[in-house]
Amino acid sequence: MLTFQHKEICMKKTMKNDSCLTVSRRAAIIRQDAEENYGTLLTLGESMRRAYQVEELIDRMRWDNVDFCLQRTDGTCLSITGTLTEYEHYFGRPYYENPSNRFLPYYDVHCRKWLTCRVAGIVFGSSVKKN
């Protein structure tokens, strides 16, 4: 059963013409991946919040360079500037996000190459601890 907070996240996503099922599916993947690779147990609310934030990050990356942080499996954070603006140029097709995919491709502006990161490793807001 969804709580008020989860319904609110789903309603925001639905207003952007994306289904609540997409966010829920990505939240389940994030929750499972965080436990397997980072040893972190996420609540349903936290995984839903992260899933929604990942969707927003992808939307911003389609149009511009975005600064974000990745948590490595050893706990350190890596600051990255990435984009998806040239995805279609390099790969010959537009980027279609798949909510069941554990990885997010991005073009690292500083390294000047295409890389992937684990969606569960993306760190948002106050939980960022730079080392």
Residue positions per predicted region:
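Cationic, low-complexity basic patches in intrinsically disordered or flexible, solvent-exposed regions
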Residues: H6
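Charged, amphipathic alpha-helical segments
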Residues: E36-E56, I80-R93
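A short, Trp-centered hydrophobic/proline-enriched beta-strand micro-motif
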Residues: R62-R72
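Short, conserved turn/kink motifs that form compact alpha/beta structural patches or helix kinks used as
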Residues: L70-F103, Y107-H110
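Short, compact, well-ordered microdomains
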Residues: N98-N131
